[in-house]
Amino acid sequence: MVDKDNAITEGQNAERLLKDPLLIKSYEVIQNDIFQQWIRTEMEESDKRESLYFSLRGVLTAQNVLVNTVENGKIVENELRGGK
C-alpha cells in the first residue's frame, strides 16, 4: 500500500509541477533557446545541430517523465477507488 500511496503522491506532485507557471516558462525558454540556436547553425555544423537535438530530447524526456508520473498516479488512485 505504501508504494501505491507513494505513486499517488508523486503523481500529484508531478501534476503540480507541470502546472507551475515558472516551470512552464522555463521549459518554453529552454526549448525556444535550443530551437533558435539550431536555426542559426551553418550548413556544415551538423555536429552542433545533433548536439542541440539531443539537448531538446533531454528536455522533452524530462517533461514526459512528469507526465507519465501523473498518469501512473491517476491510474493507481482510480484502482484504489475501485475503478477500472
Features from the language model and the residues they span:
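Amphipathic, hydrophobic secondary-structure cores in small proteins
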Residues: 25-65
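N-terminal acidic leader/helix
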Residues: 2-40, 76
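Short, structured coil/loop segments at alpha-helix boundaries
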Residues: 1-2, 20, 45, 59
